[in-house]
Swiss-Prot record:
NCBIfam families registered for this protein in UniProt: lpxK
The EC number(s) this enzyme carries: 2.7.1.130
Listed name of the protein: Tetraacyldisaccharide 4'-kinase
Keywords attached to this entry: ATP-binding, Kinase, Lipid A biosynthesis, Lipid biosynthesis, Lipid metabolism, Nucleotide-binding, Transferase
Residue numbers binding ATP: 56-63
Molecular function as annotated in GO: ATP binding; tetraacyldisaccharide 4'-kinase activity
Family statement: Belongs to the LpxK family.
UniProt xrefs under InterPro entries: LpxK, P-loop_NTPase
Enzyme's top EC category: transferase
Physiological role: Transfers the gamma-phosphate of ATP to the 4'-position of a tetraacyldisaccharide 1-phosphate intermediate (termed DS-1-P) to form tetraacyldisaccharide 1,4'-bis-phosphate (lipid IVA).
Organism, as annotated: Legionella pneumophila (strain Paris)
Catalytic activity, as annotated: a lipid A disaccharide + ATP = a lipid IVA + ADP + H(+)
GO terms for cellular component: plasma membrane
Amino acid sequence: MSFFVNRIWYGNHFLQWMLVPFSWLYRIVIRTRRWYLQRFCQQLYPIPIIVVGNVTVGGVGKTPLVIEIAKKIQQKGLKVGIVSRGYKAAIKHFPYEVKLNDSAELVGDEPLMMARKINCPVVIAPKRNEAVRYLLDKHSVEIIISDDGLQHYKMGRSIEIVVIDGMRKLGNGFCLPAGPLREPDSRLKQVDFVIVNQGAAEGTYSMELIPKNIVRLSTQEEVSNDLFTSEVAAVAGIGNPQRFYSTLSQLGIKFNPYSYPDHHQFKPHDLNDIDLPVIMTEKDAVKCYSFSSDKLYYLPVEAKLNDSFWEAFWSHQQLQGYY
């Protein structure tokens, strides 16, 4: 996302007011689309479908939350599967079940990361109903989580969870193109849970992304932060790199930032010319396994939510009888 667009969406740039008429037109279109798809095209399923999505453009921390929810479901002894779009995946035949030895270029960075962190099937398809049917046909799953897909209204859902960035929140509050909203903020009143990443607000639940030990990519060994007493290169190809940079600062690591577009497919030449040790996000690291070296490291994070969320989650009527 360009710096200029950020100024319009998350600042008070005068151009936003010129775009407001188009935002109102966009609101009409998406409301009509949602009504039509829910009424005439939505497919319902015999098991709970949990959608973890957002109402804004850009990264908000959905994938770590999906991973944490999947782990909690498994701890209850339930079989869970995950569906994802597979954004920028090179593969053309869908649905496709992600394999641990797949490349991020083939299946997408987030699906590959989830498959490697959770012992459950992860299936990608731009048409999420195809992925859901695949899981129902090929695996005896009891609950399905959709990573993103809040606006994919052809897919029925039992629970909707929206994640909001606690730093950027809803920006200027306008829908596209004047603001960052995919849907009006009134949509938040219709979902089951609103989770604020690194923040809190009335009627929402708070989530923290807890940094774990830094890992050397080539050997997968954990290393101490004391290894990075001098400056490093912080490389990020994610929707909101500022959060990653802030985390490194909180850990006392000095760095030079190297920002790339979200879902950037890293190549060796992106990193070869950097003479410093490189620390990146785990999502970016899965794209670099084929050319890993001893100078490449990544910082895993883990989503943490308080007990009040989990009590409300497991008390939801759509999950009654599933634990």
